[in-house]
């Protein structure tokens, strides 16, 4: 009984977040099957895979966000009602692992010269950018979920958007990106729920 419940819960997580699980599957497959001639160090292999996964996820999420309407966002909030904490923990763990991998890559670089050295340093820089974009998109989805889930449960939303009754993903991305770059909340107003 417990195993069946856990399997159903896992399936609901995969089904409600296909973009995340597709990106993870592609990243893991790339890390496993990337030729050694492309990435001879394991840390380089995992950074390439991480970047491919995060960029794929950001692209898939952007396509979904562009095609979404407030009605679909409301429906998605109901569908993804569980597992929000798990997703945020995974984002923090992934970002921390990414930073550790960057540090590892920079250690590998110290004995390299010329174009190879430049390519490895560029990989570390691209990893910073792709990780930042990934985190902003994850928080965009988290903020949108919380906003519309509050409406599903009859609670006030945690954010107020000026002159906006039904904010779209672009509004939430703007909010996440402003916080992600400056720690400020711009025109949106956050409300604490006690």
Give the ranges of each region predicted by the language model:
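Loop-to-helix transition at the N-terminal end of transmembrane alpha-helices
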Residues: 41-59
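Transmembrane alpha-helix/helix-exit interface in multi-pass inner-membrane proteins
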Residues: 128-154
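The first (N-terminal) embedded transmembrane alpha-helix
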Residues: 13-36
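Membrane-helix interface/capping segments
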Residues: 62-80, 103-113
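Conserved small/polar residues in nucleotide/adenosyl-binding loops
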Residues: 192-194
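Juxtamembrane helix-capping/reentrant segments at transmembrane boundaries
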Residues: 73-93
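Short, Lys/Arg-rich, polar N-terminal cytosolic tail immediately upstream
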Residues: 1-13
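Membrane-proximal soluble regions of multi-pass membrane proteins
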Residues: 147-189
